[in-house]
Amino acid sequence: MGVKNWNNVIPWRWVGLEDISPGTIAIDLPNYLTRRLTVMKTTKSKDGRLPLAHVGAFLGLVRATLNSHILPVVIVDGPPESRKRPPNPELIQTANRLYQEFVKDGDPYNEDISEALWKSRAMRMYFATNHIKDLACVIGIPSITAPSEAEMIAAAMCRDNLVDTVVSNDVDAILFGSPHVTKQLQVSNNRILRVRLEELETHMQLDLERLRDLAVLCGCDFHEGAKGIGPRKGALLLQRHGGLLEVLKAIGATHSIREDFIRAREVFDEPSYLSTDGIDLRLNPPIVPKLTRSLRMVMSENAVQTTVEKILRLWKGFGTQQSSLEQWI
């Protein structure tokens, strides 16, 4: 969900790709997949084929970014925040089981798997997340499982200058302290739609601490918010009273209600305690045999050969590597 009614207050700007190129980007994979799956084909294929459009989308992203001297880093969710509605564990377990069956059988026309995936967009998302994580590994793209929310560790990585932006349309990435967030990545058009934290602070006349207060007042993933308070009214209240607790007192919130708001607000402070030490963001050599096998599950032999050759060329051209390609083949 992100934060309620913030779409029109974020000063997103179209800028040239040079804003992040050459560089490294952290991709909030759950957010990215959710957006992609909403525009992908949603009706069952007549030939019974599994919904695997995410593979082409991811390979296209990898080719476009590497070709523009941008290293994509895939970030996936860990355990959800305690105040966030937890995902359906049975759904996740089923998606994981279906994916393992798919990897074992290598059959993109498996009727049982296909039927289950076409019935549930959420199931497809979890399946696709597993698939893309494995593809990233064999391609050589860094893949990280977050301690909690993907956008939280991604924001910490951007804060610590490990990456140049966080690719997500969830404003939580900004509130978690990322100084640069990209909503749309249009590499082929040589542009991105992004916001800088300092621009949002200036636009709203609130610093990061007060922006976090505002998010909780408006309603976010961790609290339903205060009734009747949107971003502009909330900003005025914070400017007038100084902070979340003071605003809650001013509007007559009881002690127990104030405590609940404060506990939700504390979630946004968690990135301050996250360490990015030891995170390795190098582009590794493609593991050609495993990549070839993975691609054979989803495309023709000619397409596999062409795709592998393109990825190898991109890897060779991206930068100097310590390992020789031969030891990986």
Feature annotation, model-predicted:
Residues N8-I10, W14-S21, L197-I329:
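Non-catalytic nucleic-acid-binding/docking modules located in mid-to-C-terminal regions
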Residues S21, S45, S68, S82, ...:
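Generic serine detector
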Residues N8-V15, K46, P79-E81, E101-D107, ...:
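Short charge-dense sequence patches
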Residues A122-F261:
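Nuclease catalytic cores that cleave nucleic-acid phosphodiester bonds
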Residues G2-I10, I20-E149, I153-M157:
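Noncatalytic, basic helical substrate-engagement surface that gates or grips nucleic-acid strands
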